[in-house]
A protein has these predicted regions:
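Bacterial Sec-dependent N-terminal signal peptides
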Residues: 1, 5-11, 18-59
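Polar low-complexity intrinsically disordered regions enriched in Ser/Thr and small residues
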Residues: 9-17, 325, 375
Length: 381
């Protein structure tokens, strides 16, 4: 059936045209509103992304404490099985008065920690080695280190023997977190404290160690014990850290211990009285762009410094300060690369209110300048 709508009048036509124009205007307005809303939404998303990026950058660059429920110090960090493992000493409240003989640093065991990423959850794997399990050791399990070779993990640690002389021991495990089984005797020819084992790209491993004052390094010369050992006079060359190639089984030295010489920019040995640059303790070695970086603590001036060289034995030339003084007496550190980023692990005593024997491990991103020098970090951050 056909319906005849009839002829539209001019008024009807005008009304339709007017309504059509209104629809066009409304449509344009909707498009404009949508466009503005879209721009506003995109701007909001952009600003949120910038804010999140800024927060992440702040988190990334701000030093972080590793754990809060246990006091740990002297962290040696390594990458094993695509995780970071940290091997620290374990501080305790020993009830011993703080004195110059450092008996109040009476650590008795080692806990090992791991994480999938910096800033992520940290796993405490519990006690990996206790002084009671080490036949030759008497007390004071100080700063350790670890290494992997031959399908085994090796934990290196200093401890005082039954006669109160510091020796360096080694314990072995099938897993990076332990537990570790100690050798029945310390490493032959070892002495002093703070072992750090570095494996070069050619597969050779070296141990760096030594520490003056309570670390007893001043009681040795050319690897031999001496009577009445003392610090050199201030205008004489300072005591040097020690280095030795490790045996293939990683359980002994493969050679006699050698001095590792640290020179000033003038090419002369750093003097014993140069407390801002001379070696005190806390050896660490890492490699960056083909250069060897030996870093250490200056002890009583509370700085972490570094020197560079062209081979594992040196000599090394002093370059600068990595970390300014922290809250607490001094710091001890390690440097490791993980997934393209370099990190500095160290400790301070801020959480314990400045008690030097109750320390907490921190981690911060480490950066290099174009010339290979290290950008200095503030210890109080």
């Amino acid at each position: 059936m056909r319906i005849n709508l009839g002829k539209r009048t001019s008024r009807e036509s005008g009304t339709i045209t007017h309504e059509y124009h209104l629809l066009q205007i409304a449509s344009c307005q909707l498009k404009t509103d949508y466009s503005q809303m879209k721009k506003s939404t995109l701007l909001t998303i952009f600003l949120m992304a910038v804010a999140i990026s800024t927060i992440n950058a702040q988190i990334k660059h701000k030093p972080l404490y590793l754990v809060k429920d246990i006091y740990i110090a002297d962290p040696s960090a390594h990458v094993f099985n695509e995780k970071i493992y940290v091997y620290p000493s374990h501080d305790i409240e020993a009830g011993i008065q703080e004195t110059n003989n450092v008996d109040h640093f009476n650590m008795r065991d080692y806990h090992i920690f791991s994480m999938d990423k910096v800033g992520g959850p940290v796993t405490d794997h519990g006690v990996a080695l206790d002084v009671k399990e080490v036949p030759w050791a008497g007390r004071q399990m100080w700063a350790p280190d670890a290494a992997f070779k031959n399908g085994k993990y090796y934990l290196y640690f200093p401890a005082k023997d039954k006669t109160d002389i510091f020796r360096i021991g080694v314990a072995v495990s099938d897993k990076p977190e332990g537990p570790f089984i100690p050798e029945t005797s310390p490493i032959t020819g070892s002495f002093s404290i703070d072992p750090a084992v570095f494996t070069d790209t050619d597969g050779k491993s070296y141990m760096y160690f030594g520490g003056i004052w309570g670390g007893q390094l001043q009681h040795y010369s050319n690897g031999k014990a001496i009577e009445c050992g003392a610090q050199p006079a201030g205008d004489k060359p300072s005591l040097n850290p020690q280095v030795a190639l490790m045996s293939k089984d990683m359980l002994q030295f493969a050679e006699n211990v050698k001095n590792l010489e640290i020179l000033g920019p003038d090419g002369k040995p750093i003097k014993s009285g140069d407390n801002d640059r001379r070696f005190f303790e806390a050896s660490w070695m890492h490699k960056f762009n083909g250069k060897y970086y030996f870093s250490y603590s200056t002890g009583d001036t509370h700085k972490l410094c570094y020197a560079t060289g062209d081979n594992p034995y040196g000599p090394f030339t002093w370059q600068g300060v990595i970390l300014t003084p922290v809250v607490g007496w001094t710091s001890h550190h390690s440097i490791v690369e993980f997934k393209g980023t370099w990190y500095l692990f160290y400790h301070d005593s801020k959480p314990s209110g400045g008690k030097t024997w109750l320390r907490s491990v921190k981690v911060a991103e480490l950066n290099y300048n174009a010339d290979g020098t290290i950008k200095m970090l503030e210890g109080t951050d």
